[in-house]
């Protein structure tokens, strides 16, 4: 399956800085300071990307992060205002679990998870973060979880069903038919 790269110029992307971190390198003459940023971009309609930027000045680090995020865009399948199914993913020591929620619930998420979900256009979702709360790892785990989502149509195709049959089974919580 070949993934097509999403053209960022065709989308109206918003950007949000998740973290700005001052880092230092110790050299013979003292410390050299620079800045590291984590940036999330998205159009609020199912496209989201994350990027990291490093530079001597904050605006330059943010610009580099935005450029990296635009090169790293993915399409997130939405089911109305929420996600199509539960997903759990980990990155390093951070684990993120995302659950679909009823309309009107809102984005129940902490720092690191919330900006990624909001930039993707997800309005109703429950989330739980386990393990490390390092913002970089949490953002990457969330991004990985969103990229693992499959649409209702794709799930039905994989199971040899129509989306309507799959949805009806979910609503009734019927077990899959057993073959003799």
From Swiss-Prot:
GO terms for biological process: translation. GO terms for molecular function: rRNA binding; structural constituent of ribosome. One of its GO terms (cellular component) is small ribosomal subunit. Keywords: Ribonucleoprotein, Ribosomal protein, RNA-binding, rRNA-binding. InterPro entries: Ribosomal_Su5_D2-typ_SF, Ribosomal_uS5, Ribosomal_uS5_bac-type, Ribosomal_uS5_C, Ribosomal_uS5_N, Ribosomal_uS5_N_CS, Ribsml_uS5_D2-typ_fold_subgr. Residues 13-76 form the S5 DRBM domain. The N-terminal domain interacts with the head of the 30S subunit; the C-terminal domain interacts with the body and contacts protein S4. The interaction surface between S4 and S5 is involved in control of translational fidelity. Part of the 30S ribosomal subunit. Contacts proteins S4 and S8. With S4 and S12 plays an important role in translational accuracy. Located at the back of the 30S subunit body where it stabilizes the conformation of the head with respect to the body. Belongs to the universal ribosomal protein uS5 family. This is Small ribosomal subunit protein uS5. It comes from Roseiflexus sp. (strain RS-1).
């Amino acid at each position: 399956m070949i993934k097509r790269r999403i053209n960022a110029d065709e989308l109206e992307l918003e950007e949000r800085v998740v973290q700005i971190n001052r880092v230092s390198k110790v050299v013979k003459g003292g410390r050299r300071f620079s800045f590291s940023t984590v940036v999330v971009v998205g159009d609020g309609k199912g496209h989201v990307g994350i990027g990291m930027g490093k530079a001597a000045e904050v605006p330059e680090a943010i610009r580099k992060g935005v450029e990296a995020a635009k090169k790293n865009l993915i399409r997130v399948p939405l089911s109305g205002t929420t996600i199509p199914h539960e997903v759990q993913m980990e990155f390093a020591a951070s684990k993120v679990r995302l659950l679909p929620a009823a309309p009107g619930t809102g984005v129940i998420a902490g720092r690191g998870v919330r900006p990624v979900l909001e930039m993707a256009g997800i309005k109703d979702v429950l989330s739980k973060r386990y393990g490390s709360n390092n913002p970089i790892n949490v953002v990457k785990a969330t991004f990985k979880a969103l990229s693992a989502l499959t649409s209702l149509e794709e799930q039905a195709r994989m199971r040899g069903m129509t989306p309507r049959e799959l949805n009806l089974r979910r609503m009734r919580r019927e077990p899959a038919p057993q073959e003799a």
